[in-house]
């Protein structure tokens, strides 16, 4: 009976961390974990991190740097611990700041506005592409100004707070 109880506790912990992410995200984390678990023992240790860095071209990583990474974990880093660590890091991320930073990549001068045509092109041709209808809906809800600029700072504020900035 005791092993079943232990298993239930582990299962409960798993269900909490696994509910933080969508299934596709969990699969992506699993792929990253598998790549980092160089010796395929189900745990990421110092040697795995060193080998991962080497595979990425960083061969002179200091022991202290690797030790600091390992210390972030509460114990041996299996997949559940790995997922929990990422969940805790992502949980603290401010959604408004995250979205603003994504727009700022395209606004190196920091004006707070982008040409609507450029935004439309980026949304329909890059990464997880929006459909024409989705972009049309966005511009219907957040129309560009008379000069064709989209005030992305205000857009992000409305997305994250549900109201316009004063």
UniProtKB/Swiss-Prot annotation:
Phosphothreonine modification sites are: 52
Q: What is the effect of changing residue 13 to T?
A: In CMH10; with mid-left ventricular chamber thickening; decrease calcium binding affinity; large increase in its calcium binding affinity upon phosphorylation
- What's a single GO CC term here? cardiac myofibril
Q: Which residues carry this modification: Phosphoserine?
A: 15, 19
In this protein, which residues make up the domain named EF-hand? 24-59, 94-129, 130-165
Query: What happens on changing residue 58 to Q?
Result: In CMH10; impairs calcium binding; bind calcium upon phosphorylation
- Subcellular location(s) of the protein: Cytoplasm, Myofibril, Sarcomere, A band
Residues that bear Deamidated asparagine: 14
Origin, by domain of life? Eukaryota
Q: Which UniProt keywords apply?
A: Calcium, Cardiomyopathy, Cytoplasm, Disease variant, Metal-binding, Methylation, Motor protein, Muscle protein, Myofibrillar myopathy, Myosin, Phosphoprotein, Repeat
Tissue specificity, in the record's words, reads: Highly expressed in type I muscle fibers.
Please give one Pfam family short name: EF-hand_7
Biological process (GO), any one: post-embryonic development
Q: What the entry says about post-translational processing?
A: N-terminus is methylated by METTL11A/NTM1.
Q: Which GO terms describe its molecular function?
A: actin monomer binding; calcium ion binding; myosin heavy chain binding; structural constituent of muscle
Give the N,N,N-trimethylalanine positions (modified residues): 2
Extra remark = This chain binds calcium.
Q: Which disease is it linked to?
A: Cardiomyopathy, familial hypertrophic, 10: A hereditary heart disorder characterized by ventricular hypertrophy, which is usually asymmetric and often involves the interventricular septum. The symptoms include dyspnea, syncope, collapse, palpitations, and chest pain. They can be readily provoked by exercise. The disorder has inter- and intrafamilial variability ranging from benign to malignant forms with high risk of cardiac failure and sudden cardiac death. Rarely, patients present a variant of familial hypertrophic cardiomyopathy, characterized by mid-left ventricular chamber thickening.
Described purpose of this protein according to its UniProt entry: Contractile protein that plays a role in heart development and function. Following phosphorylation, plays a role in cross-bridge cycling kinetics and cardiac muscle contraction by increasing myosin lever arm stiffness and promoting myosin head diffusion; as a consequence of the increase in maximum contraction force and calcium sensitivity of contraction force.
Q: What is this protein called?
A: Myosin regulatory light chain 2, ventricular/cardiac muscle isoform
Organism listed in the record: Homo sapiens (Human)
